[in-house]
């Protein structure tokens, strides 16, 4: 039996349903046979966040840090599986604490970037970080559309964390590497990330460029299918963790 055939139809609530990602996800979900669009929320909608939580089976959030924080307050009262695609949280916002608390009851998937290419780039960057000595300088450049609020992007921060972790594992005695990071907001660029390892005699570059936001909605649908089809246990997940299981199946399965 195919996964899709074994899934009971679920109601999906989109938070941020009139935004760039919300519109794409609305179009994509309308074509999925095993789920249907329930009530959604945007700043202009007449539906309350509480209604969206109580009247849907699964929530997908691409809104703003402020709205996400309020959404989590309602989810802690009425737990539902949730995919969080919003970025730009500050350390003192309390969102991380709320996510951790919610994950005690339901699966919580936090994804700064749902593109498979972004996951592969991070894997390659971590691998390269282990090979290139600390004498190599590291730089991350990211570019997004002018309306994106957070800079540096969540994806760039995640890349830096992966590189630092890999360096710490391979060069324990060396100080934590300095990673130069730059962000640009230009036009309607969907997303570009470039990681450079620069030595005295060479430069190694890993670049990922997104041409269409459809790649992000496709990644969200993969995550959604994993939640619905495999009965993902309660816990805190990232898109990397779920892609890692897919990677293991493709390469070693």
From Swiss-Prot:
<feature type="active site" description="Proton donor/acceptor">
    <location>
        <position position="144"/>
    </location>
</feature>
<dbReference type="GO" id="GO:0009089">
    <property type="term" value="P:lysine biosynthetic process via diaminopimelate"/>
</dbReference>
<comment type="similarity">
    <text>Belongs to the DapB family.</text>
</comment>
<feature type="binding site">
    <location>
        <begin position="154"/>
        <end position="155"/>
    </location>
    <ligand>
        <name>(S)-2,3,4,5-tetrahydrodipicolinate</name>
    </ligand>
</feature>
<keyword id="KW-0521">NADP</keyword>
<dbReference type="GO" id="GO:0016726">
    <property type="term" value="F:oxidoreductase activity, acting on CH or CH2 groups, NAD or NADP as acceptor"/>
</dbReference>
<dbReference type="Pfam" id="PF05173">
    <property type="entry name" value="DapB_C"/>
</dbReference>
<feature type="active site" description="Proton donor">
    <location>
        <position position="148"/>
    </location>
</feature>
<dbReference type="InterPro" id="IPR036291">
    <property type="entry name" value="NAD(P)-bd_dom_sf"/>
</dbReference>
<keyword id="KW-0220">Diaminopimelate biosynthesis</keyword>
<keyword id="KW-0457">Lysine biosynthesis</keyword>
<comment type="pathway">
    <text>Amino-acid biosynthesis; L-lysine biosynthesis via DAP pathway; (S)-tetrahydrodipicolinate from L-aspartate: step 4/4.</text>
</comment>
<keyword id="KW-0028">Amino-acid biosynthesis</keyword>
<feature type="binding site">
    <location>
        <begin position="16"/>
        <end position="21"/>
    </location>
    <ligand>
        <name>NAD(+)</name>
    </ligand>
</feature>
<dbReference type="InterPro" id="IPR022663">
    <property type="entry name" value="DapB_C"/>
</dbReference>
<keyword id="KW-0963">Cytoplasm</keyword>
<feature type="binding site">
    <location>
        <begin position="85"/>
        <end position="87"/>
    </location>
    <ligand>
        <name>NAD(+)</name>
    </ligand>
</feature>
<dbReference type="InterPro" id="IPR022664">
    <property type="entry name" value="DapB_N_CS"/>
</dbReference>
<feature type="binding site">
    <location>
        <position position="145"/>
    </location>
    <ligand>
        <name>(S)-2,3,4,5-tetrahydrodipicolinate</name>
    </ligand>
</feature>
<comment type="function">
    <text>Catalyzes the conversion of 4-hydroxy-tetrahydrodipicolinate (HTPA) to tetrahydrodipicolinate.</text>
</comment>
<dbReference type="Pfam" id="PF01113">
    <property type="entry name" value="DapB_N"/>
</dbReference>
<dbReference type="GO" id="GO:0050661">
    <property type="term" value="F:NADP binding"/>
</dbReference>
<protein>
    <recommendedName>
        <fullName>4-hydroxy-tetrahydrodipicolinate reductase</fullName>
        <ecNumber>1.17.1.8</ecNumber>
    </recommendedName>
</protein>
<keyword id="KW-0520">NAD</keyword>
<feature type="binding site">
    <location>
        <begin position="111"/>
        <end position="114"/>
    </location>
    <ligand>
        <name>NAD(+)</name>
    </ligand>
</feature>
<dbReference type="InterPro" id="IPR000846">
    <property type="entry name" value="DapB_N"/>
</dbReference>
<dbReference type="GO" id="GO:0008839">
    <property type="term" value="F:4-hydroxy-tetrahydrodipicolinate reductase"/>
</dbReference>
<keyword id="KW-0560">Oxidoreductase</keyword>
<dbReference type="GO" id="GO:0019877">
    <property type="term" value="P:diaminopimelate biosynthetic process"/>
</dbReference>
<dbReference type="InterPro" id="IPR023940">
    <property type="entry name" value="DHDPR_bac"/>
</dbReference>
<feature type="binding site">
    <location>
        <position position="44"/>
    </location>
    <ligand>
        <name>NADP(+)</name>
    </ligand>
</feature>
<dbReference type="GO" id="GO:0051287">
    <property type="term" value="F:NAD binding"/>
</dbReference>
<dbReference type="GO" id="GO:0005829">
    <property type="term" value="C:cytosol"/>
</dbReference>
């Amino acid at each position: 039996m195919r996964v899709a055939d074994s899934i009971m139809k679920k109601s999906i609530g989109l938070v941020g349903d009139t935004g760039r990602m919300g519109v794409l996800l609305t179009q994509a979900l309308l074509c999925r046979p095993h789920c249907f669009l329930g009530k959604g929320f945007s700043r202009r909608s007449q539906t309350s966040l509480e209604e969206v939580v109580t009247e849907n089976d699964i929530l997908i959030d691409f809104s703003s840090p402020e709205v996400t924080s309020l959404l989590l307050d309602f989810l802690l009262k009425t737990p539902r599986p949730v995919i969080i695609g919003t970025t730009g949280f500050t350390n003192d916002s309390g969102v991380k604490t709320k996510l951790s608390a919610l994950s005690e009851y339901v699966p919580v998937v936090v994804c700064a970037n749902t593109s498979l290419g972004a996951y592969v780039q991070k894997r390659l960057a971590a691998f390269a970080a282990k090979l290139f000595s600390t004498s190599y300088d590291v730089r991350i450049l990211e570019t997004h559309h002018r309306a994106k609020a957070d800079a540096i992007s969540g994806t760039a921060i995640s890349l830096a964390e992966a590189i630092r972790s890999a360096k710490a594992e391979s060069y324990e005695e060396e100080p934590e590497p300095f990673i130069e990071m730059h962000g640009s907001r230009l036009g309607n660029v969907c997303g570009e990330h470039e990681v450079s390892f620069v030595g005295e005699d060479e430069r190694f570059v890993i670049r990922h460029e997104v041409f269409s936001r459809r790649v992000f909605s496709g990644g969200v649908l993969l995550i959604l299918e994993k939640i619905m089809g495999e009965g993902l246990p309660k816990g805190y997940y990232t898109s990397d963790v779920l892609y890692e299981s897919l990677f293991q199946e493709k390469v070693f399965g």
